[in-house]
């Protein structure tokens, strides 16, 4: 779990049991999976900001790529009949060759983050085909929530607008105005 984001589940904490695991530590992942003996695993863990992947490409690969292998290998070594879902990203498409993207659109990732998510997509398929596991990936596009971090553009805008309305801020400051995102 991501420690700073635990506040996002405060309303539900009495209804869930949290099993801690560090995606960079195979033994903690193995221990967490063994302790809860899951029927299903949904891997939403990972470095999720493209700009961070340029500053920390090795950490991005360790968490997003090797971390996934740690999950899958733990399931295999524990001989669990467990379904695995890998959250992948539209960043796998990178420089898109067509709009909208489909299952037939070529992948062309343009960042360490995009490459790491494409790795997750393909390694999930590889394990499914090699071991007959129930393992699948979903390519997620932008998704918004009040729980999303303030560093993301939509939250940056909505938070600033609220502050401006209440006289707590005068201007909305944004970064790269040439950046493009598909919110389709």
Language model region names:
Residues 7, 97-100, 122-183:
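NAD(P)-dependent short-chain dehydrogenase/reductase
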């Amino acid at each position: 779990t991501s420690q700073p984001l635990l506040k996002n589940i405060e309303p539900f904490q009495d209804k869930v049991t949290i099993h801690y695991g560090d995606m960079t530590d195979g033994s903690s992942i193995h221990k967490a999976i063994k302790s809860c003996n899951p029927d299903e695993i949904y891997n939403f863990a990972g470095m999720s900001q493209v700009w961070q992947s340029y500053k920390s490409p090795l950490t991005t690969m360790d968490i997003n790529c090797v971390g996934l292998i740690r999950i899958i290998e733990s399931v295999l070594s524990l001989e669990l009949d467990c379904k695995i879902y890998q959250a992948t990203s539209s960043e796998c498409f990178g420089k898109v060759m067509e709009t909208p993207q489909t299952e037939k659109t070529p992948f062309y990732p343009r960042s360490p983050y995009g490459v790491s998510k494409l790795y997750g997509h393909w390694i999930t398929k590889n394990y499914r085909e090699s071991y007959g596991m129930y393992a699948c990936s979903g390519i997620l596009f932008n998704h918004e929530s009040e729980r999303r971090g303030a560093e993301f553009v939509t939250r940056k805008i909505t938070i600033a607008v609220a502050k401006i309305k209440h006289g707590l801020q005068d201007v909305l400051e944004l970064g790269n105005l040439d950046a493009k995102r598909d919110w389709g």
